[in-house]
């Protein structure tokens, strides 16, 4: 069974931001995208209140930029959905929609 240092569930802005910081700190983050890769912002036409985009930005573009930045710092992105998590003991055990299981020391 694969054993990860840091696993992040969800690929919205919070997931990618966590991956950027975890990657910069050397924690080798792996992001599992979930049901909607890029999160709900991929459904948003224009975002006008996000720092660094004075003219606004499309939701898809923002999420693409966040993904690139997370990958730049070592994040790996996987397209799977978590269906079960055992958080009763460490390392945590997560099961995914393809029947695979993963151990992780840190879960975000």
Enumerate the language-model features and the residues they cover.
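Flexible, glycine-rich phosphate/dinucleotide-binding loops
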Residues: 15, 38, 56
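Beta1/beta-strand and adjacent pyrophosphate-binding region of the FAD-binding site
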Residues: 1-14
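Core beta-strand elements of the Rossmann-like FAD/NAD(P) dinucleotide-binding domain
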Residues: 2-4, 96-106
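Hydrophobic/aromatic beta-strand patches that form the interior of the parallel beta-sheet core
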Residues: 30-32, 78, 108
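N-terminal Rossmann-like dinucleotide/flavin-binding domain of flavoprotein oxidoreductases
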Residues: 42-101
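Glycine-rich FAD pyrophosphate-binding loop
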Residues: 7-9, 23-43
